[in-house]
């Protein structure tokens, strides 16, 4: 369930309360100490007490017990499990246990971005360990095959299992949205990652990877459109249930006449579907905005410095924080594109700004040019870039907060737009209070050029802020268009009926007059409230809830994929089929667990 509180300040919280009915449904009990849910079958603690986490553990690990369907049967089963009677459990043979262990290790290798050939190395490590610690158990490794070919096959099997789970859930989606991310790159090829966010009957939201599309093979917008429609058809989804599109703001996505979004919106138009809501500022906001605010190619210059530090200044203690930060993002080996993207982060620029004196001294020591450190205009642009990118970092991090609805995310966007207006006003007044790095540079330049009355031109930076404001206005125009829907969804009891669309006024008036529903609204989170709201009594309001809940409210899943790609760029640059890449990205981004029993059964049947 999704937990957007009903206050003006949206917080991320979830009522982590164990429900007694879960004992029979999922074979778990409330632990004597601490939070979570204790599984009666495997005696493992499910750390979270969200129903979907408890259910996923049950479906992935103990689907065998679904054969006990009657209430009396389930009650008797629970009692026997409480007493420690495991005779009914599906007993795995040694071969099946070895298969399951091999599958689990292959999944772990995929999560860590390790190559197929490293399975053999893991096998050898375990053998050395067991020979020293448990020599009598070395034989268990004989049935675990981690050869490269088997590892590849198992990753594909896990991907197929996860994809089947997604498709089964997709059939029940009341509404869904797509996120189209064309910033994924592997070696020299770009990919379009297509993520789906669907909402079920009980307002339970599912976010997952739908497919990946190789842009080298699908260069035209028409080819991309066909590939996406094929993926939707395979999942059993029609365009009539699509509510929203969130994309990057590249020309391929939002070009006025030839962008993919315009094609998809045209295709989705029908008498029975909602107008598709599109917003393009969520994905890679910090990265893509940096190209608009870097007015003097600052980052290209800094990139040259960092490459020089990595090759000639690696042993210098003053640069260790910078090198450590770089290696934590993408390891010791990094290509130029990864490095450039990393330097476009507010956090990285802030660190480099703090090291600017040390970098200048280093450049002098190796005989490199230091002309930029005496360029007044360049230094001012550098300070301004550091400050504005730090503000973009803040909003980008806020948009990574998941498990809130789009209404909360849009509120954060509006708050940031107010911040931009404040920055614009302060720059016009030559008030650098909100520009700490810029202020430091200006103070230093005033000391250096005491006779110069004009250190910088505020109009230059006002234009940048103004351009950023217009970009945000354009990116989130559709969310403003449905602002009333978002407000109605977030605050149904305080929303004035006269401001609501005519079609919903009768339902809204009836809802606000219902004391029982008001009491539920006060004590439940927003997702639980709408899940319990009668679709027969309030069909239009329930429809609005499905619509809003299906909109992407964060960039978390896309950032998770991008971080996985960046961190494992060297491994993913090896020759891999698109099928294997899709499997790796799905394993890395999904919240679902594979159904291990099904995978073991398929392995035995093959």
Curated annotation (Swiss-Prot):
The modification Phosphoserine is found at residue 147. InterPro entries: SPIN-DOC_Znf-C2H2 (IPR040647). GO terms for biological process: glycogen biosynthetic process; positive regulation of glycogen biosynthetic process; response to insulin. This is EPM2A-interacting protein 1. The gene is Epm2aip1. Interacts with EPM2A. Its main location: endoplasmic reticulum. Keywords: Endoplasmic reticulum, Phosphoprotein. GO terms for molecular function: identical protein binding. It comes from Mus musculus (Mouse). It is found in: Endoplasmic reticulum. The keyword Endoplasmic reticulum applies.
